[in-house]
Amino acid sequence: MGSSLNDRSVVITRSLSQNESFRRLLEARGAHVVEVPLIAIAEPEDEGRERDEVLQRFDEFDWIVVTSPNGADCVAPFLVASNAAGDAIRFPSLAAVGEATARSLGVTVAMTANPARADVLAEQFPQGTGSVLVVQGNLADDELGETLTAKGWTVTRVVAYRTVQLRPTREMMLPAMAADVLMLASGSAATAWFDSFGTTTPPFVVAMGPSTAKVALALGLEVTDVAPEQTLESMIQTAERVIATL
């Protein structure tokens, strides 16, 4: 049986560097993909100096917690190089929000939140008195760090990357407005959509996870359904379910 997305037009709003895998998955279902990159991933304001300084001494921490594949891409080179050289005094335990983040780290991960949400990781993280490095983007809130602190840990938070907003061209906007489905993979993408399009959306809007849906709803966007897991496959399956009910 074919996908209900076959011959449907689907808008994806992730950064260009992240859109390719999403586009391939949708095209495999027969969807017509409309790419409207509304965000981009950039270096932090200090060009990553603080991040790199902290990661160069990562073996001082008992745990490293990474909340996204973007953060994992910043951490992985330090971990892999040290692991290969065998020069780390000790290797911290690693915790990741979601399987995609865990895979991006490139080394063994002790704890993976599933579904891929920071609040799930915070809940399952143990009580302790050691040190934890939390690696996040500039738009992440402090809830994860605060929860770990309440559990007894000494938390250091470092901004690994910065999410910046892009403005779509008119040539991008027209096919997006005529599409069947809008995929919002983050709260920042929802905000960027609102800033460019207002509350006007395609007929169906799928949000990745409750945090993205919360931002979209607060902006006045009508969210048709919420993917239960913060993965591309979960978003696609949710969109298929929505379309199949027509």
Residue ranges and their predicted role:
Residues M1-L246:
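Conserved beta-alpha
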